[in-house]
């Protein structure tokens, strides 16, 4: 699926940067929370992640409807395959990360509140109110595995995406990066 026109419109550019920068911020906060056990950040991480899902779905629909822009310059077949793989990985990851986070939290009994609005209830343990009882431990674990592995794969995909953009701009000297800034 390739666009005939190489230019990108304001909707494409806006969704790209809004989703991309928000996602990078969520990944940074997620890593920080995991490394430092900063539990106070979890509600913010969950809230922004759930709202991001509301942007990701239209972005994916828009991208699939519009197609991917044609490659600039003369990329090798291997480079074209790598670029397309990274593009699809980023689209899939921006959908799977919020969904798996919601799945992990909701099925794990932790609930989900988006900026205080309860979407999925918590399931506190009556014997210990500081603990929760999973609604479905298996689905919570599946969400946890997808979220953890997906986060690592998304870091790789983002690094490859940024490296490709910089290569196009500084080595190939084509318009790939410029077209993501100006409609």
Model regions and ranges:
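Membrane-embedded alpha-helical bundles that constitute the cytochrome b-like, heme-associated redox core
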Residues: 1-183
């Amino acid at each position: 699926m390739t666009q005939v026109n190489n230019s990108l419109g304001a909707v494409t550019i806006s969704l790209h940067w809004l989703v991309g920068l928000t996602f990078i911020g969520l990944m940074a906060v997620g890593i920080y929370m995991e490394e430092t056990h900063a539990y106070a950040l979890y509600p913010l991480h969950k809230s922004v992640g759930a709202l991001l899902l509301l942007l990701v779905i239209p972005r994916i629909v828009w991208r699939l409807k519009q197609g991917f822009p044609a490659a600039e310059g003369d990329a090798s077949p291997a480079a074209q395959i790598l670029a397309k793989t990274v593009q699809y990985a980023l689209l899939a990851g921006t959908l799977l990360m919020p969904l798996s986070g919601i799945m992990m939290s909701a099925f794990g009994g932790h609930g989900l509140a988006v900026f205080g609005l309860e979407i999925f209830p918590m399931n506190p343990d009556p014997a210990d109110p500081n603990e929760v009882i999973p609604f479905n431990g298996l689905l919570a674990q599946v969400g946890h595995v997808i979220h953890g592995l997906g986060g690592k794969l998304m870091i790789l995909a983002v690094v490859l995406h940024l490296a490709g953009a910089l290569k196009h701009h500084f080595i190939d000297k084509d318009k790939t990066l410029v077209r993501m800034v100006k409609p």
